[in-house]
């Protein structure tokens, strides 16, 4: 059983998948930082010095000053600002993955089609081997 697991784990696809997951996790952290630290502050500034990560709806109706204060008090809140950041995070990751896949597909060479191995008999229209000098169906001589 251990031998089977070792063979499975050492297959190229499993190792490639593991590397992809690790790199993807690290890339996700970079994108989250880009969204939270670079993209959202200018957008917040344009919208009147708004910090999206602190946007929330207080479901208790007590009117907390900040999201942190509401969470510290245990009040039920909808943190829609964090949701906006997460959506932007996803859109950026999806767009970058799209660009990477598009470039990879552009660099792939189209496979050269194999030359035909059959031809059509000019007399009986049967498919015959390309090297045939006589048709096996009608026995006509081929050029």
Swiss-Prot record:
Pfam family, one: MscL
GO molecular function: mechanosensitive monoatomic ion channel activity
SUPFAM superfamilies xref list: Gated mechanosensitive channel
Subcellular location: Cell inner membrane
GO biological process, one term: monoatomic ion transport
Transmembrane regions: 14-34, 81-101
Entry GO CC: membrane; plasma membrane
InterPro entries: Mechanosensitive_channel_CS (IPR019823), MS_channel (IPR001185), MSC/AndL (IPR037673), MscL_channel (IPR036019)
Membrane topology designation: Multi-pass membrane protein
Chief place of localization: membrane
Recorded superkingdom: Bacteria
UniProt entry keywords in alphabetical sequence: Cell inner membrane, Cell membrane, Ion channel, Ion transport, Membrane, Transmembrane, Transmembrane helix, Transport
Function as written in the Swiss-Prot or TrEMBL entry: Channel that opens in response to stretch forces in the membrane lipid bilayer. May participate in the regulation of osmotic pressure changes within the cell.
Family per record: Belongs to the MscL family.
Assembly: Homopentamer.
HAMAP family linked: MscL
Record protein name field: Large-conductance mechanosensitive channel
Source organism per UniProt: Geobacter sulfurreducens (strain ATCC 51573 / DSM 12127 / PCA)
Gene name linked to the record: mscL
